[in-house]
């Protein structure tokens, strides 16, 4: 068997003719039994040794190969009477409805036939889809009278799954077959059946192919009992009924009995193909479990396609819990030694690496940078046991392959499910570390959407140089710092730097002696500089490229009407000149997960490796800073003085009074409806507006009492590190209007939300305006808004997964070709230029081809103005 | 909360436990409902009524076990937990076999099965024990009970939320101007649930607007024909009992017009040969015949009529009654339901809010055990009659004691509680008691599960409804796909056990309510 190679030049899809089935059949299956008393297969039964063998002891009677090597061979069953194939019941019905019941000609006039034939041939010539033409033919070929023999036609119905009823008479499969046989080849083409590969009558089975035993292996239980595959069970049923039907027919049994058996044979053949066909009770196992027949093997998530062909289990992969480690670089992953010793990299032995490989083998499979297997050029795999390694070492020469342990610097693929976008799988460099978890840098959490509450991730080791090279050029972490969706990776670390800046205003001194902020040698700052210590801005400048120039507004910028630029006290105007941070704080805008300006600039100007360096050193700097200064928050940060509370209270009372006024106006009919709205809608909108303003205002009042320099919660909110101002004002001042399904809360008791309101009351409180803050009391209506959010997230996760699958299925074959066109797998052009503008969002400035503002600024800085 | 209110809270918890709802409900089940189920179950008849088995009182003993050596001893929960046993009680029932024309025999006490016992219920050994006694018996004195021990695993029965039975629920289908609405009653009588649904819908071509569907009738019936079959013979009777409002009367009149020829009335014969009484009889008969054609198509006419009458007596609104003399009462009920439905269509009445807690009922462990026991007991009686028949067929003297296989009932109960697969195909009714923490246990005992499917959105049902105030905890619900469908009772919520409707009726009448 081995060594016969053939190139597939084309694949034809058609139906199998009875002759085809007989031709490929190596055995006629007649008896329903499986084994004789001694447990050996009998001839002409389902386990016929000519169908192939399982288990290595036997040899196949057809090809002589041993079990495991013999692919198996088909057999066949001659059916005593023809039966309809469930899969084609619909097609048969369609064809029968479009042909004459007497002469089996298609129900079209000669001219129509000519016309359609022409069109079909033309379409075939042009390799276009025939579906629309065939559809049209079927719609057209519905006549009450045959144009060829003038026969009156009767309506044909399909009684699911396989009964075909004409008027009141149920056609037998034989009659169906006869009609289909009479169709001429010419007509058959018009009906969408290409006579070169299929004949319509082949949809009614007269011979049933029997799959080889390798397809339906029986298993031997510990008790020595044999347990057959579901398919074998089903085939036994078919054979038994077939046998009885044959005997009855030969004995000349009454028509009724023959028909009953025929019906039964049809049922068994139907369930053999599809045990979930609508309209038939599923065939069951003795235990009551429905049998898993052919269609069930292929269908659905656990079916052959989705489970074994689109997705496979692989070797050389590892999975464990992830945990954070800031000392691992963004493009690295910490791999436990235990895993590193298990998953291996195959290395070709050459003259140049043979010594190193020998060292690996010397270490053996149990000592870390060792090797597990050696593959000889003849393909034999030898395990590098401690006992055998001497022999192996002796024989080792170029051409051997050594499967050595994973070690530092290897490239691996790292992945976290759900793999929603391409950044869910990235290439990392290995760092072998102790303990049992994968360690990853905090900055790569956002693209993987990973946290450390027990998340697990997968690692795959490349097994070929080609895959490794491909991953290195396309999949490395640093190449994905800017991506179509995420502007960049990191989040959460900027707090410290910005915080130090705001509090120091560039004056307070901050010394980093114990840990140099930049791992690169030679750039570590000397402990003293011109007789004074370093400022934070100077230290941060150390991680910036030397010739970086940029100007932007930081996240903390309040967007004043007139920009004070450098003079503003909060230091929101960031100026970097020649790699020196002159003014401004470093916050989310610098290198946040979506907005990072500096990081963005570095990626584009200095390349992704420089960006990686920047990200790593800035993170380390931030950690050093935070270890130095400490940073914490408590509920005291959300405390405001009594005076502020009174002001807020007064303000809210005022707003509620205004709502009451609106309601009064509405009740008196004085309210003017807004254009396009009913009176009720107008009132709702106005109330919502008043209450929204009230909440914002009360928030503003609370905000004005917050101390921006010392209040850590506020710093986090303003720099964009964590939390938003809204959270803080809700905690201190006023929670605000709760909304359910986009409006105020209306559901509840009869005409009121809760029984302690008046019926029909429309006021702020009764419809879910929460006057108090989170620190004060909470009321039931507050939970309603909260519940809605909870339900939304729960439902969304479930729905988005399915949507993702559909989208992926629809778009997976689209590619951008060398001309920049988007093309599907048939070569049909979807877009003439990618995205209609040919811009790669990851490599452009915010999706634009040129960022003029940035250019102007750069030129201005460079010219020294 | 005001300081003084805490006193009330303390007083409340002095009197009530957090698992009272389970224990009270189970006690009620044990002391009243088991007997009731046995009394109302269909008696066993053999050989066309030659032999009947009569049942008497049921007695339930406190849990004990029979060891392999035949000795009997009390069993405490701890022992059951440690020895992989089931904490269950012996049930015995008085039974006797009556032979037609034979003499009265004495009641025999027969062991019919084992009933899993809820901890701290009245038939539990722990009932009423003090702190020290509990510790002596190996129990955690703070443990509240309310769960079962089956094969040493602790299983609690979760409370089920369902839409209120025996109550008309009006709902609109689609938007208001689509003019479609439905009135649904889930009518329950001794465990049998019949869903009656009356729908108002514009017919596709010709046909009636008001259609009704109920169990054992394929498809839908025109309401007016059903009303006629129930005894509202003349057009006038039907129309006036539906409504006094002319507009609604017209809708009914239209339906009568449209559906008239379905009755295949012989109008000449009616006019000339019949007096008024006969005509009434004739009209009702033809309506019943029409229904008969639907429920037993292709059968003999006598059987069709019998079957039709059987169906409307037994499967239409069974909570009103299953006797033929309740038909008129059912007709009036349906007519009233129709008026309500028509009011919804015209916009005069608001449809019911399905999530309003007034339209919900909670089925606690006792209620669920009742369902289970009823089915288990029926399978016991079925097994009994099979065995009795077999011994009769062999010519042996039938004996009740030998015919009872106590395993049938025990295994049925045990299996359901052990796996959570309840009767009616519901899964997850009993769950492994959460012992993650004491609070986890308490929360599990107060859990309320809605039978709505997890996979569909059901946004409305998941929302917190203001009417849940005081009954359902607004905060505790999982964040999983079950969000809002799995709820927990509010800390101070109690569940009442329900009372005899006749008793209540009497009280209300005494208070001066007429009709």
From Swiss-Prot, chain A:
Its cofactor is Mg(2+); Zn(2+). SMART domains: RPOLA_N. Its EC number is 2.7.7.6. Keywords: Cytoplasm, DNA-binding, DNA-directed RNA polymerase, Magnesium, Metal-binding, Nucleotidyltransferase, Transcription, Transferase, Zinc. It is an enzyme of class 2 (transferase). Zn(2+) 2 binds at residues 100, 103, 146, 149. It is found in: Cytoplasm. Zn(2+) 1 binds at residues 60, 63, 70, 73. Residues 515-531 have a biased composition (Basic and acidic residues). The keyword Cell cycle does not apply. Transmembrane segments: none annotated. Binds at least 2 Zn(2+) per subunit. One of its GO terms (cellular component) is DNA-directed RNA polymerase complex. GO terms for biological process: DNA-templated transcription. Mg(2+) binds at residues 451, 453, 455. Its main location: cytoplasm. GO terms for molecular function: DNA binding; DNA-directed RNA polymerase activity; magnesium ion binding; zinc ion binding. HAMAP family: RNApol_arch_Rpo1N. Part of the RNA polymerase complex. DNA-dependent RNA polymerase (RNAP) catalyzes the transcription of DNA into RNA using the four ribonucleoside triphosphates as substrates. Forms the clamp head domain. Belongs to the RNA polymerase beta' chain family. This is DNA-directed RNA polymerase subunit Rpo1N. It comes from Methanothermobacter thermautotrophicus (strain Winter) (Methanobacterium thermoautotrophicum). The lineage of its organism: Archaea, Methanobacteriati, Methanobacteriota, Methanomada group, Methanobacteria.
UniProtKB/Swiss-Prot annotation, chain B:
The keyword Plastid does not apply. Pfam families: RNA_pol_Rpb2_1, RNA_pol_Rpb2_2, RNA_pol_Rpb2_3. It is an enzyme of class 2 (transferase). One of its GO terms (molecular function) is ribonucleoside binding. InterPro entries: DNA-dir_RNA_pol_su2 (IPR015712), RNA_pol_bsu_protrusion (IPR007644), RNA_pol_Rpb2_2 (IPR007642), RNA_pol_Rpb2_2_sf (IPR037034), RNA_pol_Rpb2_3 (IPR007645). It is found in: Cytoplasm. GO terms for cellular component: cytoplasm; DNA-directed RNA polymerase complex. Its main location: cytoplasm. Its EC number is 2.7.7.6. It comes from the Archaea. GO terms for biological process: DNA-templated transcription. Keywords: Cytoplasm, DNA-binding, DNA-directed RNA polymerase, Nucleotidyltransferase, Transcription, Transferase. It catalyses: RNA(n) + a ribonucleoside 5'-triphosphate = RNA(n+1) + diphosphate. DNA-dependent RNA polymerase (RNAP) catalyzes the transcription of DNA into RNA using the four ribonucleoside triphosphates as substrates. The Rpo2 subunit (Rpo2N and Rpo2C in this organism) is implicated in DNA promoter recognition and in nucleotide binding. Part of the RNA polymerase complex. Belongs to the RNA polymerase beta chain family. This is DNA-directed RNA polymerase subunit Rpo2N. It comes from Methanothermobacter thermautotrophicus (strain Winter). The lineage of its organism: Archaea, Methanobacteriati, Methanobacteriota, Methanomada group, Methanobacteria.
